[in-house]
């Protein structure tokens, strides 16, 4: 499948900024979306070309990755500690971050990180919750 568009996502709790670029770096579209399943699905469904997307791994990027992944030719998460181009820039805002992520994925320079399958992430979530409950029970017994 020939990928024609490269999309950079700057993910936040309540919004997602995006920038769509062609293979030569021309900006086709950019904007901000509300971070909800319905809005993201509708937006991704309207993308006409096969696209390759990337976002920085954050606390909120897991469910966004799961929502967008079926629509993308390829979707990756960038390792936050290794994405120095964004962190080191002097001029920072969400729009510019999305542009830089689109350029990084377009040039195939994304330091990708492992994204565990949904089942594994759900097991991890349950184990974290269990550890919390066990810790609270232990604190109560020790009072």
What name fits each language-model region?
Residues 1-143:
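Phosphate- and other anionic-substrate recognition elements at nucleic-acid/protein interfaces
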């Amino acid at each position: 499948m020939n990928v024609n568009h490269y999309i950079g996502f700057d993910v936040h709790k309540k919004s997602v900024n995006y920038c769509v670029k062609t293979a030569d770096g021309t900006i086709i579209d950019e904007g901000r979306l509300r971070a909800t399943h319905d809005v993201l699905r509708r937006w991704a469904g309207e993308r006409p070309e096969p696209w390759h997307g990337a976002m920085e791994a954050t606390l909120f990027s897991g469910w966004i990755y799961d929502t967008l992944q079926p629509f993308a030719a390829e979707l990756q998460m960038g390792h936050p500690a290794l994405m120095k181009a964004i962190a080191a820039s002097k001029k920072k805002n969400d729009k510019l971050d999305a542009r830089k992520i689109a350029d990084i994925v377009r040039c195939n320079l994304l330091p990708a990180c492992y994204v565990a399958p949904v089942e594994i992430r759900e097991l991890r979530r349950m184990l974290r919750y269990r550890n919390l409950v066990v810790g609270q029970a232990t604190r109560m017994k020790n009072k």
